[in-house]
Amino acid sequence: MKRWMLVVLIAIALAAVVLFVGFTQIKLDALQEPGHLETVFATQAKHLLVRWSSREGIPPAPANLQASIEEGDKLYGTDCSMCHGPDGHTPTDSGRWMYPRASDLTSFTVQRYSDRELFWIVKNGIRLSGMPAFGKVESDEHIWNLVHYVRTLKGSEHPESGGDTH
């Protein structure tokens, strides 16, 4: 019985600490950058959820990679560059003022996603991040073309980049 009470007291104390840290470190306003704890927690949670969500239901990629990249370049100009910028590294004013700001597509954080995970992100979007879902306006083939084009951006990675915000 004493052991059970100790476990309950520890759980209550831990919950109190988590709530205190949560309420003091996580802000709702978008006037300043999120704190380190919030950024780490949100990024890790997002990566885990994207990995889990992309396990099934992803159609096969187009066979001709070079043609897919060329088509993806065209689509990028109309679908993605308005936020991520023409180079995928320097967001436009719209992308900079999103909260969180548009991701640097050349960053390690974005490029470490698998092709399946990137496909899932482009198709489904990321709720509350500014990343829209293209699944209702673009075909699966077009989404694969965008994924293949984004992969070509990794050669221009900028190490000083913060990287992932979506």
Residue ranges of model-derived segments:
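Periplasmic c-type cytochrome electron-transfer domains
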Residues: 4-70, 135-150, 166
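Sequence/structural segment immediately N-terminal to covalent heme-attachment motifs in c-type
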Residues: 66-89, 118-120, 166
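Protein kinase-like catalytic domain
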Residues: 84, 151-154
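Extracytoplasmic electron-transfer domains, predominantly the class I c-type cytochrome c fold
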Residues: 97-151
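Extracytoplasmic/periplasmic copper-protein system
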Residues: 159-166
